[in-house]
């Protein structure tokens, strides 16, 4: 699957056409009020481009929350999003109370030129995800012919299809892969994601550094193995470093995280790194705690001293930070996925914050820096560095699967150039 050869919105003829666009309006809500409109704001350039280039209408579809295939308009309706969209676009948005069916098809058949239409939550229908559960908790499964009907109805709502929902690209849901139109393009958000991941995965400048943090080795095996085929350098930190250090250095790790499953493949990983000539940097010192608590008593340890029984490592220490700074300074391309410590708590945030500062510095000197979604993106928001790195991915699961070398169904479904 080539990321850089997919049809993009700027190459799509939208004049006089109805554009059906899959967006990600899965925004946080409190009592039907949107608490963060970032995802809605992010979709505006793609919507505006269609309108400015003479599209007859833009029909928007999205999911919100996890209604599991059951209509829950009181809890998960997209209606509040229509109001927010209206204020951001400065024009009326027609909200429809469903996303498929005869009424919706009629409303979208011949809309007034320049219309913006928002459909109700896709996941009110079990046919979107293929499975769900009813209010009693019983599992429900969509019937194949109903899935086909659902997809056929969505396909009637537009003449061309645009997908701007990278965060859901790793899911083979109906709205991601089932709209049957001849031209299927990525929107500008999706395009930016694909452009940056193509830079890392298809044609990397070197030296290329991957920084991998997070808790469990087992969760990151596929990621580590795939990246070892691509990179020159790797930093392994976070909770999973303790498993490596215990296996490789026989380090005493006290009550730190230890991953039994992951421990079995540590030696394989090191053999592969050696074979590929990849240098892996591990932490050499640690900030420790006497319990997993924000206000725990804080101590310090090194690989040589070990971590005493009952204590746990929750961050890397100053020597590790110096080592990381040296490795980062040499790189021309960096992909970072996973924090180096419990960054949510100030006492254990220094390692991740020090690394972030070095990444920002490297970016200002021309290094390409890509932050995988999820917790690492949260770090960027916390320290206000989103515009000080090259790219912060909007998709945690989707970016992880790309870096693992998997094919994303939502990207594969797009037309090739």
UniProtKB/Swiss-Prot annotation:
Q: Which Gene3D superfamilies match?
A: Phosphoglycerate kinase, N-terminal domain (3.40.50.1260)
Q: What is its EC number?
A: 2.7.2.3
Q: Which reaction does it catalyse?
A: (2R)-3-phosphoglycerate + ATP = (2R)-3-phospho-glyceroyl phosphate + ADP
Key words, A-Z = Acetylation, ATP-binding, Cytoplasm, Glycolysis, Kinase, Magnesium, Metal-binding, Nucleotide-binding, Phosphoprotein, Transferase
Q: In which pathway does it act?
A: Carbohydrate degradation; glycolysis; pyruvate from D-glyceraldehyde 3-phosphate: step 2/5
What cofactor is needed? Mg(2+)
The listed locations are:
Cytoplasm
Give residue numbers for the modification (N6-acetyllysine): 11, 48, 75, 86, 97, 131, 146, 199, 267, 291
The keyword Transferase appears for this protein: yes
| UniProt binding sites for (2R)-3-phosphoglycerate | 23-26, 38-39, 62-63, 65-66, 122-123, 170-171
The GO molecular function terms of this record are:
ADP binding; ATP binding; metal ion binding; phosphoglycerate kinase activity
Q: Which residues bind AMP?
A: 215-216, 220, 239, 313, 344
Q: Residues that bind ADP, according to the entry?
A: 214, 238, 343
**GO annotation, biological process:** gluconeogenesis; glycolytic process
Q: Name one GO cellular component term.
A: extracellular exosome
Which parts of the sequence carry N-acetylserine?
A: 2
- The main place the protein resides is cytoplasm
- Which family, according to UniProt? Belongs to the phosphoglycerate kinase family.
Subunit text: Monomer.
- Its name, as the record gives it, is Phosphoglycerate kinase 2
In its UniProt entry, the species of origin is given as: Macaca fascicularis
């Amino acid at each position: 699957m080539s990321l850089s050869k997919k049809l993009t919105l700027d190459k799509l003829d939208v004049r006089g056409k109805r554009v059906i666009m899959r967006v990600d309006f899965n925004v946080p809500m409190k009592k039907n009020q949107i608490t963060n409109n970032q995802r809605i704001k992010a979709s505006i350039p793609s919507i505006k481009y269609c309108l400015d280039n003479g599209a007859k209408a833009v029909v928007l579809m999205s999911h919100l929350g996890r209604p599991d295939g059951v209509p829950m308009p009181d809890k998960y309706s997209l209606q509040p999003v229509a109001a927010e969209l209206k204020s951001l676009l400065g024009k009326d948005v027609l909200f429809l109370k469903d996303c498929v069916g005869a009424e919706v098809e009629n409303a979208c058949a011949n809309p007034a030129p320049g219309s913006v239409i928002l459909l109700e939550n896709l996941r009110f229908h079990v046919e979107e995800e293929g499975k769900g559960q009813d209010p009693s908790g019983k599992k429900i499964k969509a019937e194949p012919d109903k899935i086909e009907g659902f997809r056929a109805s969505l396909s009637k709502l537009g003449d061309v299809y645009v997908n701007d929902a990278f965060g859901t690209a790793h899911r083979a849901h109906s709205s991601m892969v089932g709209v049957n139109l001849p031209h299927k393009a990525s929107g500008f958000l999706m395009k930016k994601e694909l452009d940056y991941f193509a830079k890392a995965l298809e044609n990397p400048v070197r030296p290329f550094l991957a920084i991998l943090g997070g808790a469990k080795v087992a969760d990151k095996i596929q990621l580590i193995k795939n990246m070892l085929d691509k990179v020159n350098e790797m930093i392994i930190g976070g909770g999973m470093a303790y498993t490596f250090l215990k296996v490789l250095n026989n380090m005493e790790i006290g009550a730190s995280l230890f991953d039994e499953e992951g421990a079995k493949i540590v030696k394989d990983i090191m053999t592969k790194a050696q074979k590929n000539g990849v240098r892996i940097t591990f932490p050499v010192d640690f900030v420790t705690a006497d319990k997993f608590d924000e206000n725990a008593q804080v101590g310090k340890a090194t690989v040589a001293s070990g971590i005493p029984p009952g204590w746990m490592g929750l961050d890397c220490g100053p020597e590790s930070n110096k080592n990381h700074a040296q490795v980062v300074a040499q790189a021309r391309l960096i992909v970072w996925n996973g924090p180096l410590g419990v960054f949510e708590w100030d006492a254990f945030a220094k390692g991740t914050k020090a690394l972030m500062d070095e990444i920002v510095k490297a970016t200002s000197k021309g290094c390409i820096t890509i932050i995988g979604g999820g917790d690492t993106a949260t770090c960027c928001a916390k320290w206000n560095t989103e515009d000080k790195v090259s790219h912060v991915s909007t998709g945690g699961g989707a970016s992880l699967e790309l870096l693992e070398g998997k094919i994303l169904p939502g990207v594969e479904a797009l037309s090739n150039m």
